[in-house]
Amino acid sequence: MKKLLSILVVTLMLVGVVSAASAEVTIDVFQLKVEIDPMLQDFVKLYSEMTPDVTVTAETLGGGADYGGAIKAKLAADQMPVIYMIEGAGGYDLWKDYIADMSGSAWVADTDLAYYSPEGVPVGFPIAMEGFGLGYNADILAAADIDPATLTTLSAVKAAFEKLDGMKAELGLDSVVSCGTSTSGGLWWVTSQHVFDAYYAGYLDYNDSSVYDMARAGQMDTERLAAFTDYLAMLYQYSDQEILLNGNYDSQVAAFAGGKAAFITQGNWIDPNLAQLGATFPMGYISHCYLEEPTQGLFMAAPSWFVVNSQATPEQQAAAFAFLDFMATTPEGANYMVAEAGMVPAFKSVTILPSGPLSRALVEASARGGNYNWYFGQNPDGFNQYTLAPIFELLAVDSDKDAFIADVTAAFASIAQ
């Protein structure tokens, strides 16, 4: 009898092990880049078909929505995703108890853009190399006899804006610039994060964080901030006011794609949108030139990182690590990142070049050098959206540059460390 019971127990244990080994694992990806959602959906479907015991789903929250708030809501509902995004130190500090060590992942040795914890542990998978400046329609500039290569100083850009503004009817323009700063329209990040990065990083060496560090200490470079404010006010002045104050991502991009604006304050992530809208004109980037010191530098970095939830089950974590390795190191992953999603890859082994014109402009700028880092992701969670964004929007409403400078200065004093 004892022998029979022993055999039965061992048999049940083996059945349990086999069942556990063959049980399907489901992992969910929660991300914020709405422009790549269709491509990501196709990729996770492909991966799920290629790995029968793993199902990957993807959910996208975009359009300037509160991504951090959405993750908090998921955590409160016991629905914390297995793979999600952080955008820098602010996100890491907030979610560090839910971020796994990815030291054993194959992709780590294939990139210089991994996100590392303060202890030097790789924890973040770089989504891509992204960048921005002031995008331009080369055909419109040529029609106005403006050479974009000469637009390297504030005075040169200002003269070009004035000339184009006087030719709007002739050129079929609604505005010189397509820019948005609406909090309700979800474009708060365009100005309070991306354009404002020119204050933090412009005209400095790539790893020179002195201006940003000074701001985080509660001290602003008053001359630099005043010059930036003049430039920002100029962008606002020459923008379509409806898009500026009430527009959303789609309306901002559509104005540029349709030839209704000569410039746009967006990054290379709009390449797929431009293709979908049928924009075939040549385009490129100039820098955010707010000083008279010549610059061609663009603002380039990894925009965000996938992290794996360390509180997920061991099986889910292992499946998530394998999924990210597949994305980074296989031809299928390279095809998704570059050919389908139009991203500039963050991984050295990926040799496919992006076809999108703005992404190609970034590749050229990277080869040229003299580009600038991103610092807005190091601000505390919610600071860019809920503190800075209303200040940037208010300047578009009342044009009070002194009040803008005072409000920005006070905002950084409130988070001084």
Named regions from a protein language model:
Residues 100-114, 176, 181, 198-227, ...:
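Short, solvent-exposed loop/beta-turn-alpha elements that line the ligand-binding surface or hinge
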